[in-house]
Structures are given as structure tokens and as C-alpha cells.
């Protein structure tokens, strides 16, 4: 395993507390405590908390089987959903039978994952149960508001108390579908794009599929010596094979191996791996844009457009983004001409009677400094929304550039400012401090 694994985007772990010696069976339904030491103020709803296990110092054992995660709400200690995810020396997720069961030996670059919304109040050390032989407190902090929440990771060397019965998400590799209580996403077989998005009535949706498919257009132009090459690639040219899938209580992970079809006279070109992480109210796909020196020197033009094309039943839904704050309706043809398309923006929202979702597209800060923009794509017929990448010939340096695409199911019809909490997952990730308290 790699000692230099990446630190977490955000963090937190839970330990429980109870006064006196209490039998293990009590933990199945939660236990009443004395008053909490500090009340939770953290309000981040969508954020996963990903703790690099390298900071979990002083654990009595690195075997994951002996741990449970807890939080305190209204003076009651209860188990919350969590999982350990194993990563190898290269930082890749390990898809093994033991990892799937959440049982393996931790090293410095594995991850502990739970939801920020499940953190609770802080408890006094003396309230920790005698049935556990070790406890770690992780304080989760919003770097913007300084709001905090706490979670506690407890180790048991004897009989294990029950874990949380909650499972937030599941990915089915056979049907290529991810499902939570709030949304369902369908992936096209053998390709890396979506063909279905359903928002549950619990969040104002109808559970009807609003998405026809995602479409992609990549059209570079290269000039080398006396020749010019201008290939056109669409979403159909990028084939994938599911290389691994893991379902945990908190997140489901899908990894695919990608390849690019260069035409009938050429073999498919390997395109590396891509992950999608599914959480209870969101899913994200981090990616890497590779720009070798020779490609950069030969690049003369670059067109990129990626859109979600919606079904006709969604034509009454509305669109808005950071540079188009006014409501644009897909059914109004004039709105397509009125949309501002040439200014940079990092989010848009589509909403209506079928539910409301936000999509954010994050690019490297360097790109923005060089004048590369994420333009608006808004089309009334057929209804479609997405992004373009403008001024890509401004790329100045070769390298591998990190990007991220995230979908968030909003809890209500859009109100001004609702995007802030969703974007905070990527712009201002939660921070954590860890303390061994028993």
C-alpha cells in the first residue's frame, strides 16, 4: 500500500458514549445519554465524509471487522451507516470479496466513508461505553461557516453490537443501474453515458424517466507538418467495460475501462479507467484530461459539447445557471436565442414537476487563468442542457488535468442560493480533526 495516498476530501468518524457498563444489546436501538457536551451546528446535507485512514492514529487493530460508527442526536447514541474502502499502491479501489464485505486490514491510503448529515453532537469522554476498548472522535468542520458535527469510531474486541441497518445506495452491474431512495440512474450498456434519470416523490419528483440520453461531441483539429487531421468523436465512440463494482452502506462505486474507437482501420485506443461514486443524493465522476506535448503543439482547434437531452415529457421544465439567472423554459423557442452562452459558469439547475437537479462541472484553476471557459448549452427542441468548452487552444502546458462532474438531487424547487451547498462539496470540502479519546 502507498504511504503517499491522497488525503480525504472531507472527513469524520463516530464513537458512541454511554454512562456505566451497558450490555451490547442496548446498542441495537440507541441508548439515552446524559446531556451532550456540545451541540451539532453542521448543516451540510449532501456531502460525503471521506477520511483517509492514515490519520486514524493509534487504533488497537487495523482489522476493519471490529469497528462500529456512532453519533448522538437528542441525547441518544445510535449507529450510523459507514464503510471502509480499500485502495492499492496506485490509489485504485480494490474490488475483492473481503473488501466488499468491509473486512480487510487498513493501511495509510484506505478510506472511511460516511455522510456529513449523519454526524451529531459531541459527548463527554466519560460517557463512552465500557463494552468498547478504544474510541476515536472525529470533528467535522465546515471551513466557511466553522459549523461542526461529531462522529465516533469505536472498536470492540468481544461481541459486536449491531451496525446501522441503513443502506443508502446500490449499483447493479447487470442492469447498469444505480438506485437510492431519492433517485435512479441508468447507464447505457457498453458506453459511459446515461439513458435514464428518475427523481423520487420524496424529493418532489414523479419517478418518471426525464432523460433521453447524454450526448457528447468532441471535434479536435490537428496540424502536423503538411497534414491536417480533424476527427469527430461522439458518445458512441467511447466504449467501456465494467472493471469493478462495490456496494457499501454509504456509497456504491463503479469503475470502467475505457477505449476510443478510431475507425475500422485502427484498433481501439485504451483510455484508462473512470470511476463513478454514487451517494444517497448525488453522484460524481472525476476524470483526467491528458494533454501530451506533441498533441498540444499540433492542436489548432478544439470543440467540446456535452449535453443531457431530455424526453419530451420534460419540456415544461426550466433551466437556469450562474450567468442565466432568469428562468428559461424548454418549451419556449425564443429562450434558446436569449440564453447567454459565452461566459464561464460552473453549475446549472433543471427543475419542474419531475423534480429538480443540479449539475456542476469543475475544471482546473489554470484553465480559467488561461481564458478557457465553460459555456452554456441550452436547446429548446429537443430539450437539452449542458456545457461547452471554449478557447481550448489556450492550453499552454502539457500535463494531466483533473476535472469533476457532479449531479445533485435538490430537496426542493430551486431557490436563489441553493447551489451554494452543493458546490461546497467540491469548492470547500469539509475538514476533520481526529482524536483518540479512549
Residue positions per predicted region:
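N-terminal secretory signal peptides that target proteins for export/translocation
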Residues: 1-12
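A composition-driven signal for long, intrinsically disordered, charge-rich low-complexity tracts
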Residues: 10, 14, 54-60, 64-66, ...
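Bacterial N-terminal signal peptides
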Residues: 14-29
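Generic structural signal for short, flexible, solvent-exposed coil/loop and linker residues
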Residues: 16, 38-40, 101-103, 336-337, ...
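Sec/Tat signal peptide C-region and signal peptidase I cleavage site
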Residues: 30-35
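Alpha-mannosidase-like glycoside hydrolase catalytic domains involved in N-glycan trimming
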Residues: 37-177
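Solvent-exposed N-terminal domain segments of exported/luminal and surface proteins
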Residues: 122-239
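Beta-strand/loop-rich accessory regions of lumenal/periplasmic or secreted enzymes
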Residues: 186-438
Amino acid at each position: 500500500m502507498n504511504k503517499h495516498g491522497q488525503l480525504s476530501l472531507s472527513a469524520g468518524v463516530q464513537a458512541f458514549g454511554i454512562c456505566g457498563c451497558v450490555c451490547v444489546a442496548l446498542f441495537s436501538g440507541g441508548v439515552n445519554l446524559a446531556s451532550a457536551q456540545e451541540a451539532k451546528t453542521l448543516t451540510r446535507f449532501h456531502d460525503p465524509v471521506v477520511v483517509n485512514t492514515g490519520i486514524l492514529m493509534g487504533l488497537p487493530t487495523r482489522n476493519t471487522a471490529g469497528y462500529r460508527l456512532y453519533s448522538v442526536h437528542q441525547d441518544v447514541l445510535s449507529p450510523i451507516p459507514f464503510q471502509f474502502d480499500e485502495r492499492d499502491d496506485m490509489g485504485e479501489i480494490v474490488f475483492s470479496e473481503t473488501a466488499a464485505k468491509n473486512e480487510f486490514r487498513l493501511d495509510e491510503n484506505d478510506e472511511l466513508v460516511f455522510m456529513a448529515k449523519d454526524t451529531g453532537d459531541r459527548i463527554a469522554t466519560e460517557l463512552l461505553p465500557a463494552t468498547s476498548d478504544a474510541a476515536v472522535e472525529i470533528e467535522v468542520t465546515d471551513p466557511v461557516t466553522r459549523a461542526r458535527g461529531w462522529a465516533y469510531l469505536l472498536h470492540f474486541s468481544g461481541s459486536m453490537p449491531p451496525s446501522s441497518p441503513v443502506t443508502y445506495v446500490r449499483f447493479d452491474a447487470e442492469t447498469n443501474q444505480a438506485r437510492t431512495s431519492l433517485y435512479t440512474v441508468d447507464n447505457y450498456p457498453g458506453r459511459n453515458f446515461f439513458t435514464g434519470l428518475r427523481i423520487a416523490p420524496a424529493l418532489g419528483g414523479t419517478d418518471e424517466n426525464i432523460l433521453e440520453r447524454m450526448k457528447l461531441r468532441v471535434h479536435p483539429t490537428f496540424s502536423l507538418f503538411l497534414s491536417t487531421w480533424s476527427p469527430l468523436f461522439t458518445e458512441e465512440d467511447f466504449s467501456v467495460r465494467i472493471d469493478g463494482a462495490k456496494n457499501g452502506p454509504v456509497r456504491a462505486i463503479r469503475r470502467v475501462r475505457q477505449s476510443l474507437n478510431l475507425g475500422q482501420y485502427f484498433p481501439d485506443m485504451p483510455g484508462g479507467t473512470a470511476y463513478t461514486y454514487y451517494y444517497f443524493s448525488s453522484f460524481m465522476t472525476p476524470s483526467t484530461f491528458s494533454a501530451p506535448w506533441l498533441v498540444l503543439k499540433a492542436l489548432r482547434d478544439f470543440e467540446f459539447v456535452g449535453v443531457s437531452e431530455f424526453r419530451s415529457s420534460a419540456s415544461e421544465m426550466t433551466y437556469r445557471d450562474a450567468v442565466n439567472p432568469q428562468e428559461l423554459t424548454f418549451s419556449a423557442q425564443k429562450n434558446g436565442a436569449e440564453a447567454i452562452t459565452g461566459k464561464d459558469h460552473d453549475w446549472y439547475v433543471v427543475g419542474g414537476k419531475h423534480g429538480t437537479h443540479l449539475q456542476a462541472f469543475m475544471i482546473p484553476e489554470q484553465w480559467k487563468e488561461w481564458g478557457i471557459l465553460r459555456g452554456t448549452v441550452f436547446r429548446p427542441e429537443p430539450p437539452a442542457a449542458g456545457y461547452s468548452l471554449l478557447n481550448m487552444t489556450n492550453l499552454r502546458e502539457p500535463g494531466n488535468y483533473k476535472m469533476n462532474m457532479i449531479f445533485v438531487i435538490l430537496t426542493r424547487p430551486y431557490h436563489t442560493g441553493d447551489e451554494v451547498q452543493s458546490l461546497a462539496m467540491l469548492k470547500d470540502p469539509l475538514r476533520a480533526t481526529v482524536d483518540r479519546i479512549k
